[in-house]
């Protein structure tokens, strides 16, 4: 039975890896209220993008850096660091091409927070994080990634055991949204996009990362255990406190 589950998960992972937003009619997917789907947006840049907008390609080295940073934090938290409880079944996060394509489409609007839907045919309620940069000179892509990760990492001072057990966006000392999303055990995949542009004398950038699921208000961020990964079918060799990438976790199922 275990081998069947793992095989099914591997097949689904391959589909996720090679899905593209051009193959799906996102305009037909349901959205809440009057919201519209980011995949239904015109592929051209919005007027908010100023001068010389450019969507940057995230190369393998950039994708690996994002995954490494996220999985480092997940591994650290899963073992009970920062005074947080141990995670029973938190897996290694992998890259998702479809989520990345939707993130790229979102950044072409050059506005961080919107009411756009990001759901796919298989991922019903993706989460997302935005990082906006403004300065005299545009940093290298790696520097933008590191700055975005640092912003989320600083939220370790705000997140508490109580938030892990019953999610909310803010702790006693501030926002926890970015970090809490990165360590959700329902998150199995991530995909990011980056657009840069010139706004007068200022160089600007928007880095958006879509995650396979989002935290639900009042529900656990992750399931707590007595030892790291005690509920994993197989532990990862590199991130030893996490389940392997083949762990069959359903991102659509709430804790």
Swiss-Prot record:
One of its GO terms (molecular function) is toxin activity. Expressed in salivary glands. Residues 67-211 form the SCP domain. InterPro entries: CAP_dom, CAP_sf, P14a_insect. Residues 1-23 form the signal peptide. A motif (Cell attachment site) lies at residues 32-34. Keywords: Cell adhesion impairing toxin, Hemostasis impairing toxin, Platelet aggregation inhibiting toxin, Secreted, Signal, Toxin. It comes from the Eukaryota. The keyword Hydrolase does not apply. It is found in: Secreted. It holds the Pfam family CAP. GO terms for cellular component: extracellular region. Belongs to the CRISP family. Inhibits platelet aggregation induced by all agonists tested (ADP, arachidonic acid, the thromboxane A2 analog U46619, thrombin, and snake venom snaclecs (TMVA that activates platelet through GPIB, and stejnulxin that specifically acts through GPVI (GP6))). May act by competing with fibrinogen for binding to glycoprotein IIb/IIIa (ITGA2B/ITGB3). This is Tabinhibitin 7.
């Amino acid at each position: 039975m275990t081998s069947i589950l793992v095989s099914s998960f591997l097949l689904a992972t391959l589909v996720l890896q090679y899905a593209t937003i051009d193959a799906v009619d996102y305009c037909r997917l349901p959205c809440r209220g009057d919201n519209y789907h980011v995949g239904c947006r015109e592929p051209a840049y919005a007027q908010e993008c100023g001068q010389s907008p450019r969507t940057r390609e995230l190369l393998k080295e950039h994708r690996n850096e994002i995954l490494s940073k996220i999985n480092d934090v997940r591994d650290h938290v899963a073992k009970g660091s920062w005074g947080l409880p141990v995670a029973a079944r938190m897996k290694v996060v992998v890259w998702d091409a479809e989520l990345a394509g939707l993130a790229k489409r979102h950044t072409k609007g050059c506005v961080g927070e919107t009411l756009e839907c990001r759901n796919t045919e298989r991922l019903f309620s993706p989460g997302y994080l935005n990082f906006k940069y403004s300065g005299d000179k545009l940093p290298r892509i790696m520097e933008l990634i590191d700055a975005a990760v640092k912003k989320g990492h600083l939220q370790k001072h705000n997140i508490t055991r109580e938030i892990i057990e019953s999610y909310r966006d803010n702790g006693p000392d501030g926002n926890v949204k970015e970090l809490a999303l990165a360590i959700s055990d329902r998150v199995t995949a991530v995909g990011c996009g980056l657009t840069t542009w010139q706004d007068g004398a200022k160089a600007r950038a928007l880095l958006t990362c879509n995650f396979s699921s989002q935290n639900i208000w009042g529900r656990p961020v992750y399931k707590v255990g007595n030892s790291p990964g005690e509920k994993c079918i197989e532990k990862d060799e590199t991130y030893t406190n996490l389940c392997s990438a083949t762990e069959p976790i359903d991102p659509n199922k709430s804790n």
